[in-house]
Amino acid sequence: MLSLNTGSDQTGFTIIELLIVALIIGILLAVAIPKLFVARFSANEANTRKAMQTLRDGESLYFEQDLDDDGLRNYTSQIGNITTGGTLRCPPSGGNCTEEDSLVDSTFEGAVSTGALADCVDPKAGYCIQFASDVDATDPLTLQAEYGWKASMTSARKTGRRDFAVYADGVIRCALSQEVIGDPGAFQADRTSNACDD
């Protein structure tokens, strides 16, 4: 005799079960994604603060040890490259240095921005770096205000939230970016900005 299969022994998930699983995954993503952005911002900003410390320490060595061999205790305003003398990458004024001569590593070279906005070839952890235009070099006998470096994010509130600056006083300063989300940063931290808190 012929029997009909009523489908009662079929296996699989019902539409309700699938919707519940999708809902749970959606809730988990809604909680996790903002935390991932915060972690990314924190990592980029920590890396940039370290870069500011490296520039500060490099400038101090350049000054104290007269690494450009010009007989003057002065700073440099250039990151440069391994063949350009009188820079943080190649302190001796003659140029043609080795990595051992360098005060900063090669990742600084592509991170240099020369305009008003953070636009560089190879950002360092989402940030561009530039020599501060508000440096006061009127008194060559003091350490105060002889150099300054700034860092700003390439995409505001996507790669970071704060801009950074460091001057001859050695204090790393921060300013919360006021740029529109996604716009390049405008190097808003300066010598009047508050010191960064940990």
Please describe what each predicted stretch is.
Residues 35-52:
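Aliphatic-rich helix starts adjacent to a transmembrane/signal segment
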Residues 19-35:
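Alpha-helical hydrophobic helix detector
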Residues 12-20:
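Secretory/exported precursors with cleavable N-terminal leaders
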